[in-house]
Amino acid sequence: LTKNQFIIEKKLSVIVSDKIDVMLGQAFECTEDGDISAALKLYDLVLKKEPSNIRALTDKGVTLQNIGKIKLAINSYNKALSISPDNLDVLLNKGAALHSDEQYQDAIKCYDKVLLIDKKSTMALAYKGLSLGELGHLHDAIKHFKKALSIDKYYDLANISKELAQDLLKSIKKEKSKTQ
């Protein structure tokens, strides 16, 4: 490349990048306004220009997940993870989608990967607790909720879930004592 070609390429790259940021912002606004179809079209336009755009893949996945298209959301997260395997946001979102699809063991694998990278991820701890609870591992679930609360004592999801799991354990113990 000549010096002028390099400068032109650089300027074009900045223009395209700015345009993509604007499109992603518009897609987010569409989602907030409930215009899901327009948001998805914008994400697809961005991905046509930049197939490896992690933000577009993630936000598209979240949008699909929010309208109940869990398998498509997981596909979007998988594409993002193939590009950036340790992206915490993508791993958390994929875990939540797998949880919604009742694939609790696979969800836990996502949360465990987050926790390997960030031991103090309150969201990963609480979400893992939810998946453990769904599998009937209430003691382990409570342990994860408590750990999340030890990091952030105001984390509502962990607090409410811990109380619910403890109530379930009490009711199970009560039922067992009645049958004995």
Give the ranges of each region predicted by the language model.
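Alpha-helical segment of the N-proximal tetratricopeptide repeat
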Residues: 18-55, 59-66
